């Protein structure tokens, strides 16, 4: 091989790494891999002087660009580097595995190396059965240590030296009865802690200490057999315990420790110097051993060990860090691997990337919501690679030859050479060849990835379309700032340009902004109208906004409309209302969405009502068009799809911006000044509050204030005062807003929702209000006062933080000081919680990153372990869930059930004469009576509904009737309303039969079962596996119950009055939308769950709040509570129980008694003062306060008792212990003084209780004295013993329950007679402190029965629940506690994300902490995943020591190795259909001569149109394949039917199997009113789709169609064509062989077998394409002549619109519905009717919105034969 010859780059695909095997290199392996022995500490800077040492040079000298390796003769970077090795003079410890060496030594005999366990014992195998690796070694060491401890403690039964011979009998690998071991006494080994830290093992034997160095330990480990090593968890083939001690040290190549060159100087790496030091110390030790001086040997050995240890880890506790100079520490191998900037996390898990840009962002309301404004400088620097082919060669050549933007930067040739175009003098002669790759500039319409850090959730990285603009900042639409959490105060964002078509396709299909309008976190929109656009919408739709013709025409141009609606006012001049203008933007939707939400028609224009796309009343506010669940954004997304939402947002922003530019809006000082009437009312509020505070203070001073449960008097006072002051601010805010005039700019912004609240306007104009710190008033901080300016002990409102002035007037100095105190708290919280929540989210991501949805519908991790049978227990996508659906079924009583669901039939099963009444068709009633079985079916329906009611009452968490709302994937109520408004007539009688309704609803439920994936489904669709069938039935149970109660036959007939067409449309919609809601296989739902739980945590505060005014139960909230739960903390700060009570203790009065019985109470807790008094005479006490009661007790005492008492007192101590009890606490606890006396005597009988005062005495005292006279030692002894005694005297309650508080809950009961359900208030006990085990035992009440209902009693301490009740109970409790932690801050996260997190924590049967102690201790995750989280080197060392193997299945492992992760689009493999490939049309034949088709760029525009111009455009269509279909496509320029037309594509040979999309395209001009989309990818369902829209659908689907239509660069996407475009009908000739019966497709049909791509429902006449030689016509019986004339169609010719917005008024032509029985083909020239319809088709202009709206497909179009054919 010639020196320095570079190897050619291989074109072969790299093999994928399937697994990684870890092991520790043995001595012979290190030597075999090395190229030389390193014996001299030389840098070999001058390689020429080291002749004869070539191998040594390649170890020491780093390669330069001109030099070649002396070993392999390759140049940099082809040379991989070569190892050397150092032969150590003595073995040394590897600091990374030193702890493992200690564990092994504890397991084996130090003399013979045998295992210190009897492996024949069953207990040994039982404990080691399920543990491997490090956990196994720890378990063996634990058992061996316990065995040795037992042996030494029972020496009488032992053998030699106190050790049982049993552990050495019959070990592994030995025959039965064979004897193992030497029986030697075993020293105790531990780490040596000397004056100077070192790696030495301390061995203690017979009280003599010895130091074992590595050579001694190596000798012991060398005697360990392979079988014993295997039992300890080692793999002897990978790592024997002897290999843990180093005898040979490998020297890494210079590529690992490159030198730094600067000018002519070179500086070696720190590791190089450390290796040199090791070589020097090693040589010195060898020389010292030859000299045989022990002191020198010890010193050299210690230095060698230290240098080797710090070479591996320079941050350990064994040695002081080695420094390379006075300040800088050595960066060892460990420091280079671990940490955020180490090799794993810094260079493998995350990398720096090319083709990215970063700059400041600014807002721009004139670009689309899915666009990003890119500066020219960025667009000319970033490039996109396009491969040259026959299709795009001409266009790319023009790019390459241009010298100004848009141009190209580089050309990559197939031979590997690169042409830099900027260096060419003459670029006009550049030629391109097929196969070249041109890196062209980023141009308008390119798809890029936009990101803002921190990337907390999926919506922080979204795809945008490029809009190249002037200036130097990224321009962002304001509606996109919410998911990015961005503002324009200097934020910077990152832009990434995809570098492949696959990446671009994934961006378009999954990451574009419209795809992410609805967040899976809250199942609600994360984007909406904000800021100025929201304010403009409110003012535009105000009831007194009227607009003239000039303004409305301007708006029409913005919206690309050419026909105005009829003005609301005609005289004296035409005026349009703002609501009419806003209606031009609205698609055909209804709001409120469901009938039960519909309010009565308001007279004050206060309620928004939208019907069929017309805003009838009400102003548009944030709740209507903002990012809120159930808003207009949400409804449009569910009804019409994401693209329609984008159109709506873009239209609103353009119109409102134009409106504000013309009408203006400003805020001035006059808006902040309150009038005299408002100031007077505010002053009255302040005076009223001040008097109220004074009353509370007076009541507290008089001790008459009602104390709250568990609170002291001072705490109750503070709670009442703080509550009164906060109410004062709220009341003032409401009055301030109501008194402000309607035109006040602040009020307008507040009511619109664009900025501010009523509290803000109150603080600005009136007063700021009470300032709180940590949820309470400003505390005393300066000698019993808040500030030196106030009196001592001033508890008034002014001195404790009340600010009585507003911002306009200005705060007083002390008010300003208090105000800054409250603000500082928020700043500190924000600073502290940022790091905590960021680390919390990282832990969540690591724990859940491998959890994904599998193709069988289950949820699994990387090892295919089952996490859930169904994602979220229902298998649905969180973004498709609709909340807020009322569910009144559980609250219906028997009478309401009968009125709503039951028909009029007798008990004997015969219909009464009233059946059907006025809501059933007479023919249906006659048919119903004809068959006696019909009654039975109706009875079964009612029985099923009654059973559903009972099931829902038992299973659901019931609330009030108006609050019980369901979260389901489909909103049937809205679909029913849509069906009624489009197909039904309110006055008509339904033509449906109840039996038909019941059968169709049951059929629908069976169809829903078939939508779920399962591997056990037979050919008939039935699932034969019981478990698989049950999980699907369980997922559908709640939805089926809701569906049955909504679509009960009587409700459909009587309440909805649906006809057959509307009912079949409704069922089809429900099925389709449910199918769309199923989660996608491969979805990384674990990461979504982690983001959904981690991102809202940033909105939490870190404080532990004291709920003032509610109870004194201290609860941990926010991030600390989350950390407690996720870390599975066993020492919770505020653990508590909820104790349920048996009747009658669940009533309030009895619950108070139970409260005292449960709360733990000792004598210490109720004792206020302890006195020691010398009082030897019991009859004449020296305490004056006790004389009366003592005299009373002596008088009632018998003489014998009195004499006995006197004798005891005389013999006892003269010192009396006087306990003064807290009267209030004794009263609260309901304690009897006799009980206290008995409790004292139960604990200690050495005391005489002289008196316990009677219960009716105001002062409660106890006098007690010792029975023994200790003389002078009495007082010290009493002072020592009495406090301990008081703490031990247990009066009542459960130990551990520090406080018990009453808590009321609602329990629903059912009246069996009427079936009515009512809620009753019952009382339970909330405790501070937990003792669940003791609570389960119970507490006996006054009647001698247990008062605690253990079945309903729970603790918030999850580990305690797990230990007592098992893992399932712990899972349920963990789920409940997580939800409550988020709900405390108003964060309502979708239920399915909690379940993923909780099931992952509990999946192994124990609670796995989401921390390094849980994730890195799990055996299921591989070493690569664990080391990428934390403890990098520790994990890798353990993996190598125990020979672990990583199967490379997880996300982290694949990222480390550069593989595609097996989630998402990487979960499946694609198989190429070679047969279909043979039928593909070649590129050269598919493209017309001289024409260029843009395959790579979504814009599809000419080069000149990419240059900045005044004509805006909106590219939208996706990439398509470079093939065309059999249709000839013509374009006309101009309006209303221009005269010029030119074909832009040639015809391809006709292929019947590939004409589906083309056929839909051809027929779309005629049947666009019938096009009905049911697919999320093709989102025009329910709205008339224009021909240009249908083309957009066509081009989007063309990626799946081998023969698809491709428009020229002039033809833009649907957004560039409005429905005002003209559709020109062209003639063509059809062959006679075409059949009238056309193929069709179902919603679940897949395109070309790729994935599960849903296609829209298409009427039969649109299902196939006519050949180029055919003409298509349609007639229908019963249609009018004018309607039938519109049915004549051929290829359409859309006309370009002059503006860039694609909006139109719907209903521009009547709806036509045709069945396939009325479709026929006619030969060209077969007598086409010539009449006025020709002029209509060529000069068509849309008209205003008319009552004849486009109706959804008819019932006939949803025939059963369609599904049968599918």
UniProtKB/Swiss-Prot annotation:
List the biased-composition ranges (Basic and acidic residues): 1706-1716
The catalytic activity of this protein is classed by the Enzyme Commission as 2.7.7.6
Effect ascribed to mutating residue 472 to N: In trypanosome isolates
UniProt keyword Transcription present: yes
- Consequence of changing residue 131 to M: In trypanosome isolates
The positions annotated for binding Mg(2+) 1 are: 487, 489, 491
One cellular-component annotation, GO: RNA polymerase II, core complex
Binding positions for Zn(2+) per the UniProt entry: 69, 72, 79, 82
The protein's matches in SUPFAM superfamilies, at most eight in alphabetical order, are given as: beta and beta-prime subunits of DNA dependent RNA-polymerase
- Domain of life the protein comes from: Eukaryota
Region described as Bridging helix: spans on this chain = 813-825
**Stored CDD domains:** RNAP_II_RPB1_N (cd02733)
Self-association state and partner proteins as the record states:
Component of the RNA polymerase II (Pol II) complex consisting of 12 subunits.
Q: Which family does it belong to?
A: Belongs to the RNA polymerase beta' chain family.
Q: What is this protein called?
A: DNA-directed RNA polymerase II subunit RPB1-A
Instruction: State the gene name recorded for this protein.
Output: TRP4.8
């Amino acid at each position: 091989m010639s020196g320095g010859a570079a190897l050619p780059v291989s074109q072969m695909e790299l093999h994928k790494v399937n697994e990684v095997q870890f092991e520790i290199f043995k001595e012979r392996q290190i030597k075999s891999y090395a190229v030389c022995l390193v014996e001299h500490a030389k840098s070999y800077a001058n390689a020429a002087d080291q002749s004869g040492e070539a191998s040594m040079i390649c170890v020491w000298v780093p390669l330069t660009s001109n030099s070649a390796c002396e070993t392999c003769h390759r140049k940099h970077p082809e040379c991989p580097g070569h190892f050397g090795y150092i032969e150590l003079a003595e073995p040394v410890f590897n600091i990374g595995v030193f702890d493992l060496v200690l564990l092994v030594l504890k397991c084996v005999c130090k003399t013979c190396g045998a295992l210190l366990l009897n492996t024949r014992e069953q207990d040994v195998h039982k404990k080691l059965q399920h543990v491997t690796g490090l956990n196994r070694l720890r378990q063996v060491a634990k058992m061996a240590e316990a065995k040795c401890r037992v042996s030494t403690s029972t020496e009488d039964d032992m053998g030699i030296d106190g050790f049982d011979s049993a552990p050495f009998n019959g070990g592994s690998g030995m025959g039965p009865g064979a004897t193992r071991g030497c029986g030697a006494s075993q020293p105790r080994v531990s780490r040596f802690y000397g004056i100077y830290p070192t790696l030495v093992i301390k061995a203690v034997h017979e009280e003599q200490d010895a130091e074992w160095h590595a050579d001694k330990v190596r000798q012991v480990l060398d005697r360990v057999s392979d079988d014993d090593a295997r039992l300890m968890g080692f793999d002897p083939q990978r790592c024997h315990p002897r290999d843990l001690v180093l005898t040979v040290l490998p020297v890494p190549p210079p590529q690992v420790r490159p030198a730094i060159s600067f000018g002519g100087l070179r500086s070696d790496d720190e590791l190089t110097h450390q290796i040199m030091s090791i070589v020097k110390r090693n040589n010195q030790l060898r020389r010292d051993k030859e000299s045989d001086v022990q002191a020198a040997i010890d010193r050299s050995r210690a230095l060698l060990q230290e240098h080797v240890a710090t070479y591996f880890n320079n941050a350990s506790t064994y040695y002081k860090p080695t420094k390379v100079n006075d300040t800088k520490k050595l960066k060892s191998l460990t420091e280079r691997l671990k940490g955020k900037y180490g090799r794993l996390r810094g260079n493998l898990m995350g990398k720096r990337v090319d083709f990215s840009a970063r700059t400041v962002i600014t807002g721009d309301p004139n670009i689309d919501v899915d666009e990003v404004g890119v500066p020219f400088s960025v667009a000319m620097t970033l490039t996109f690679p396009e491969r040259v082919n026959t299709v795009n060669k001409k266009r790319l050549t023009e790019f390459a030859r241009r010298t100004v933007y848009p141009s190209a930067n580089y050309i990559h040739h197939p031979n590997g050479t690169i042409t830099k175009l900027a260096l060419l003098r003459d670029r006009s002669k550049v030629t391109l060849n097929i196969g070249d790759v041109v890196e062209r500039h980023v141009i308008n319409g390119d798809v890029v990835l936009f990101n803002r850090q921190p990337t907390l959730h999926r919506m922080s990285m979204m795809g945008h379309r490029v809009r190249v603009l002037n200036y130097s900042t990224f321009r962002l639409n304001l509606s996109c700032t919410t998911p990015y959490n961005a503002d324009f105060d200097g934020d910077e964002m990152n832009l990434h340009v995809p570098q492949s078509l696959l990446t671009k396709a994934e961006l378009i299909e999954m990451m574009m902004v419209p795809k992410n309008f609805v967040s899976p976190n809250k199942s609600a929109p994360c984007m909406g109208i904000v800021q100025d656009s929201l304010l403009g919408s409110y003012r535009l739709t105000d009831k007194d906004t009227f607009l003239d013709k000039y303004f409305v025409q301007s708006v029409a141009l913005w919206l690309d409309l050419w026909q105005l609606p009829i003005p609301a006012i005609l005289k004296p001049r035409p005026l349009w209302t703002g609501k009419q203008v806003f209606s031009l933007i609205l698609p055909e939707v209804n709001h409120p969405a469901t009938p039960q939400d519909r309010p009565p028609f308001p007279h004050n224009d206060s309620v928004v009502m939208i019907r069929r796309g017309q805003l009838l009343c009400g102003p548009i506010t944030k709740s209507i068009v903002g990012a809120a669940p159930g808003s207009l954004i949400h409804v449009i997304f569910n009804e019409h799809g994401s693209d329609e939402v984008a159109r709506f947002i873009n239209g609103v922003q353009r119109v409102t911006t134009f409106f504000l530019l013309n009408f203006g809006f400003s805020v001035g000082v006059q808006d902040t000044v309150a009038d005299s009437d408002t100031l007077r009312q505010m002053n009255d509020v302040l005076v009223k509050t001040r008097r109220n505070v004074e009353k509370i203070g007076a009541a507290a001073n008089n001790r008459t204030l009602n104390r709250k449960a568990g609170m002291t008097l001072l705490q109750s006072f503070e709670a009442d005062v703080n509550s009164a002051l906060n109410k004062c601010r709220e009341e003032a805010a409401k009055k301030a807003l109501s008194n402000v005039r309607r035109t006040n700019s602040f009020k307008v912004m507040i009511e619109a929702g664009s900025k501010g609240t009523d509290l803000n306007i109150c603080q600005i104009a009136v007063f700021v209000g009470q300032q709180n710190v940590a949820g309470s008033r400003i505390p005393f901080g300066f000698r019993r006062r808040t500030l030196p300016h106030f009196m001592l002990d001033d508890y008034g409102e002014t001195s404790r933080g009340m600010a009585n002035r507003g911002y306009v007037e200005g705060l007083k100095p002390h008010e300003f000081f208090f105000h800054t105190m409250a603000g500082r708290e928020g700043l500190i919280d924000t600073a502290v919680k940022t790091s905590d929540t960021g680390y919390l989210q990282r832990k969540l991501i690591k724990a859940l990153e491998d959890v994904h949805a599998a193709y069988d519908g289950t949820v699994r991790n990387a090892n295919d372990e089952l996490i859930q049978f169904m994602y979220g227990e229902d298998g649905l996508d969180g973004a498709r869930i609709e909340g807020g659906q009322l569910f009144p079924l559980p609250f219906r009583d028997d009478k309401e059930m009968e009125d709503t669901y039951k028909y009029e039939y007798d008990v004997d099963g015969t219909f009464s004469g009233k059946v059907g009444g006025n809501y059933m068709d007479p023919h249906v009633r006659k048919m119903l009576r004809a068959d006696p079985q019909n009654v039975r079916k109706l009875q079964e329906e009612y029985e099923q509904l009654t059973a559903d009611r009972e099931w829902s009452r038992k299973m659901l968490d019931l609330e009030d009737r108006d609050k019980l709302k369901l979260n389901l994937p489909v909103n049937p109520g809205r679909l029913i309303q849509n069906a009624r408004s489009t197909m039904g007539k309110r006055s008509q009688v339904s033509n449906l039969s109840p039996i038909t309704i019941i059968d169709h609803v049951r059929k629908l439920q069976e169809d829903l079962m078939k939508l779920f994936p399962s591997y056990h489904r037979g050919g008939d669709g039935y699932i034969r596996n019981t478990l698989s069938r049950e999980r699907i039935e369980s997922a559908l149970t709640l939805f089926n119950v809701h569906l049955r109660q909504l679509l009960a036959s009587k409700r459909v007939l009587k309440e909805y009055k649906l006809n057959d067409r509307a009912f079949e449309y409704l069922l089809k919609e429900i099925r389709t939308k449910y199918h769309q809601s199923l989660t996608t296989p491969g979805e990384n739902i674990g990461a979504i769950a982690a983001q959904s739980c981690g991102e809202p945590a940033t909105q939490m505060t870190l404080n532990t709040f004291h709920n003032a005014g509610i109870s004194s139960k201290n609860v941990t909230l926010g991030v600390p509570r989350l950390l407690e739960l996720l870390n599975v903390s066993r020492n919770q700060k505020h653990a508590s129980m909820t104790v349920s009570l048996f009747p009658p203790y669940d009533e309030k009065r009895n619950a108070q008694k139970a409260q005292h019985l449960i709360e733990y109470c000792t004598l210490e807790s109720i004792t206020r003062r302890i006195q020691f008094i010398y009082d030897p005479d019991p009859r004449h006490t020296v305490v004056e306060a006790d004389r009366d009661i003592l005299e009373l007790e002596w008088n009632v005492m018998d003489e014998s008792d009195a004499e006995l008492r006197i004798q005891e007192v005389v013999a006892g101590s003269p010192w009396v212990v006087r306990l003064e009890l807290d009267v209030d606490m004794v009263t609260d606890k309901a304690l009897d003084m006799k009980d206290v006396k008995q409790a004292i005597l139960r604990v200690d009988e050495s005391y005489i209780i002289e008196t316990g005062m009677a219960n009716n005495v105001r002062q409660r005292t106890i006098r007690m004295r010792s029975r023994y006279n200790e003389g002078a030692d009495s007082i010290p002894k009493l002072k020592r013993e009495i406090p301990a005694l008081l703490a031990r005297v247990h009066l009542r309650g459960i130990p551990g329950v520090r406080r018990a508080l009453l808590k009321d809950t609602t329990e629903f009961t059912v009246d069996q007679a009427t079936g009515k359900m009512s809620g009753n208030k019952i009382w339970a006990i909330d405790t501070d402190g937990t003792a669940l085990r003791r609570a389960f035992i119970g507490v006996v009440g006054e009647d001698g029965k247990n008062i605690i209902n253990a079945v309903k009693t729970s603790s918030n301490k999850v580990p305690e629940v797990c230990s007592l009740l098992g893992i399932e109970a712990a899972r349920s409790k963990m789920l409940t506690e997580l939800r409550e932690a988020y709900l405390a801050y108003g964060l309502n996260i979708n239920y399915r994300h909690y379940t993923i997190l909780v099931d992952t924590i509990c999946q192994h049967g124990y609670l796995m902490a989401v921390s390094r102690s849980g994730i890195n201790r799990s055996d299921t995750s591989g070493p690569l995943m664990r080391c990428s989280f934390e403890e990098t080197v520790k994990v890798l060392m353990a993996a190598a020591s125990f020979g672990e193997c990583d199967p490379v299945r997880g996300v982290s492992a694949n990222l480390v190795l550069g593989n595609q992760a097996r989630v998402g689009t990487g979960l499946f493999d694609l198989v190429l259909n070679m047969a279909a490939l043979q039928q593909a049309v070649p590129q050269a034949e598919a493209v017309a001569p001289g024409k260029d088709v843009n395959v790579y760029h979504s814009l599809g525009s000419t080069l000149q149109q990419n240059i900045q111009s005044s004509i805006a455009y909106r590219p939208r269509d996706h990439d398509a394949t470079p093939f065309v279909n059999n249709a000839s496509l013509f374009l006309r320029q101009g309006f209303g039917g221009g005269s010029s037309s030119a074909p832009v594509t040639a015809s391809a040979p006709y292929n019947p199997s590939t004409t589906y999309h083309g056929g839909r395209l051809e027929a779309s001009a005629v049947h666009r009113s019938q096009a009905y989309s049911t697919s999320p990818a093709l989102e025009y369902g329910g709205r008339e789709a224009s021909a240009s829209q249908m083309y957009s659908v066509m081009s989007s689907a063309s990626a799946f169609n081998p023969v698809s239509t491709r428009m020229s660069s002039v033809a833009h996407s649907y957004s560039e064509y409005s429905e005002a475009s003209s559709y020109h009908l062209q003639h063509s000739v059809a062959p006679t062989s075409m059949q009238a019966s056309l193929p069709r497709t179902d919603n679940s049909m897949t395109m070309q077998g790729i994935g599960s791509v849903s296609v829209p429902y298409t009427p039969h006449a649109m299902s196939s394409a006519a050949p180029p030689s055919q003409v298509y016509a349609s007639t229908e019986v019963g249609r009018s002549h004018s309607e039938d004339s519109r049915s004549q169609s051929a290829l359409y010719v859309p006309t370009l619109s002059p503006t860039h917005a694609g909006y139109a008024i719907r209903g521009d032509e009547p709806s036509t519905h045709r069945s396939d029985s009325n479709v026929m083909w006619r030969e060209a020239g077969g007598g086409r009717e010539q009449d006025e319809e020709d002029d209509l088709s060529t000069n068509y202009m849309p008209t205003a919105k008319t009552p004849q709206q486009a109706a959804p497909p008819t019932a006939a179009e949803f025939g059963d034969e369609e599904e049968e054919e599918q």
